[in-house]
Amino acid sequence: MARYTGPKAKLSRREGTDLFLKSARRSLADKCKLDSKPGQHGRTSGARTSDYGNQLREKQKVKRIYGVLERQFRRYFAEADRRKGNTGENLLQLLESRLDNVVYRMGFGSTRAEARQLVSHKAILVNGQTLNVPSAQIKSGDVVTIREQSKKQVRIAEALSLAEQSGFPTWVAVDSKKFEGTFKQVPDRADISGDINESLIVELYSR
């Protein structure tokens, strides 16, 4: 399955909620009707969505939020199910601990896609070493830094400025002047923002 490269706003409209694919800090609500499905007049149907349909829709939404394809998402779920504790919460914690997501949460990229590009282009150091694998799992205490040559990029400075205005998650500590952040701990479920019902995904894979 190829990665989606079409209009990002269309994906948010399809899910009926802002997935923050275009800008991490600016809502799409003022730009388009999120309650209207893609299409000239929006797709309408009097049929009630089945439980399976709702579960599948939720999985698709989470995949799009984090930019993960199906095979990789299944691996994340299998690992989440293997671990002790709540499977749904484990799944979100694994996704939030991805390097590209941590870079995004620290404000170095305005979107997860932009953060993923920074990682792939070797603009990110983890504990002083270049790491260009977006899916790499970051652990408590890991220090994420922008490579010296990349600190001059205007987009990074702009993204960081917006992040400072909206505030950083409690589970990361960011030193904007140093272009550096510390992954303090894996976030609790209450610390993970987003309109996500992970229990629907657990139900889907438990069928």
Swiss-Prot record:
GO terms for molecular function: rRNA binding; structural constituent of ribosome. Residues 42-53 have a biased composition (Polar residues). Residues 33-54 are annotated as: Disordered. One of its GO terms (cellular component) is small ribosomal subunit. One of its GO terms (biological process) is translation. InterPro entries: Ribosomal_uS4, Ribosomal_uS4_bac-type, Ribosomal_uS4_CS, Ribosomal_uS4_N, S4_RNA-bd, S4_RNA-bd_sf. The keyword rRNA-binding applies. Keywords: Ribonucleoprotein, Ribosomal protein, RNA-binding, rRNA-binding. Belongs to the universal ribosomal protein uS4 family. NCBIfam families: PRK05327.1, rpsD_bact. Part of the 30S ribosomal subunit. Contacts protein S5. The interaction surface between S4 and S5 is involved in control of translational fidelity. This is Small ribosomal subunit protein uS4. It comes from Cupriavidus necator (strain ATCC 17699 / DSM 428 / KCTC 22496 / NCIMB 10442 / H16 / Stanier 337) (Ralstonia eutropha).
